[in-house]
Amino acid sequence: MLILISPAKTLDYQSPLATTRYTQPELLEYSQQLIGIARKLTAPQIGKLMSISDKLADLNATRFHDWHPDFTPQNARQAILAFKGDVYTGLQAETLTEDDFDFAQRHLRMLSGLYGVLRPLDLMQPYRLEMGIRLENPRGKDLYQFWGETITEKLNQALQAQGDDIVINLVSDEYFKSVKTQKLQGQLIKPVFLDEKNGKFKVISFYAKKARGLMSRYIIENRLTQPEQLKAFNSEGYFFDAEASEKGELVFKRHEQ
């Protein structure tokens, strides 16, 4: 099965590395095109485009300027260890074993506005370029038009290489829109995580994001190969609710903490 997760805005280029192994991103020629476009933007334009503070706009203008495609362990970091948002809090990649990284390299992909598709050990330089940003480019008005079918084609290659047609969709809607589902040669399964609040179960963003990371780790650590095995997921109090689930959607609930 192929697990899809979102990237994160928060990055970590300081912590000790859990592995020294690395690979190179496979779509860097596309990244270079986007960097070329982004470099033409002033810091105030970046701030407006991304709805971020002046300080963050300055940081990202500098990142775009400093970015260059010769990635080494000295100027870049493995994607799975560089991202540090809520999903990655659940994933805790810094405690994975070398065997876990091997499995993840075959079965986990991160979608990215700048890099398209990243494998866990792919090096990346720091950036901020969310998939939903309306960055005009030669292919259209936003990143969805820029990436077109490229991301889907890369996922199809990954599916073929890892041996089955199961796709576990743990990405946000913003990133999943970059996947052309009609062209995807896989069967989609979407885990949904509901937390109890005041007696009602609903999606609570922070918990749901972390749960996507927990589920990713559960699949990696247990080397899962069948969708049926996902139903045993019970990290941090979640349990499978068969009645609330339907074809293609597995619902997990957790009682109020």
From Swiss-Prot:
One matching Pfam family: H2O2_YaaD
Enumerate the InterPro entries for this protein: YaaA
Spell out the GO cellular component terms annotated for this protein, sorted alphabetically and separated by semicolons: cytosol
Q: Origin, by domain of life?
A: Bacteria
**Example GO biological process term?**
response to hydroperoxide
Q: Which family does it belong to?
A: Belongs to the UPF0246 family.
Q: Which NCBIfam families match?
A: PRK02101.1-1, PRK02101.1-3
User: What PANTHER family does the record tag this protein with?
Assistant: PEROXIDE STRESS RESISTANCE PROTEIN YAAA (PTHR30283:SF4), PEROXIDE STRESS RESPONSE PROTEIN YAAA (PTHR30283)
The molecule here is called UPF0246 protein KPK_4750
